[in-house]
């Protein structure tokens, strides 16, 4: 997959037009990840080998991008869509409560005072990515999302997890009666 991504990036970057490129890796997916012929088997558990291999591949891919002429005008966004769902990652289950998805923005050209350990949701990625690309938009955010670069509080920071979850899961009379036309 990485080699295909490199070929595609090389091809579209040669067009000398702005572009967006997305690649999705699923090697670390439940139940035990995918082991290919290049995966080193250093650890007793398959999932540990899979995570080590994917970490190495992504690191090599990012370093390759950094060496390319298009890197100076590029933003790299790495998002973990969710935590690993298996229960075989740690023998000591106490570590499960300390886990979080890995997310990083590389080469944004931006600085902000409050960028670490923010409380945010997936819908905050969209305005953050647009901010990284210097794309302007109205108001303090887009939809429910708030840019993590502005220092303005996200909805999760404003409301707290429980209140936000309750608000998002509540029924909407407008949606039900006006949009779905249900009585």
Give the ranges of each region predicted by the language model.
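Solvent-exposed soluble domains appended to multi-pass membrane proteins
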Residues: 1-183
């Amino acid at each position: 997959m990485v080699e295909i991504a490199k070929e595609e990036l090389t091809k579209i970057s040669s067009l000398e037009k702005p572009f967006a490129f997305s690649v999705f890796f699923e090697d670390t997916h439940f139940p035990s990840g995918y082991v290919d012929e290049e995966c080193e088997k250093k650890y007793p558990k398959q999932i540990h080998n899979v995570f080590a291999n994917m970490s190495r591949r992504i690191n090599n891919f990012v370093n390759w991008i950094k060496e390319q002429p298009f890197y100076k005008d590029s933003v790299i966004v790495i998002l973990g869509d969710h935590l690993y769902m298996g229960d075989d990652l740690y023998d000591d289950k106490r570590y499960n409560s300390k886990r979080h998805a890995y997310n990083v923005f590389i080469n944004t050209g931006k600085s902000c005072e409050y960028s670490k350990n923010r409380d945010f949701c997936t819908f905050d990625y969209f305005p953050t990515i647009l901010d990284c690309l210097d794309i302007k938009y109205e108001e303090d955010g887009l939809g429910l999302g708030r840019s993590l670069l502005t220092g303005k509080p996200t909805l999760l920071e404003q409301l707290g997890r429980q209140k936000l979850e309750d608000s998002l899961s509540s029924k909407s009379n407008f949606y039900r009666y006006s949009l779905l036309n249900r009585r």
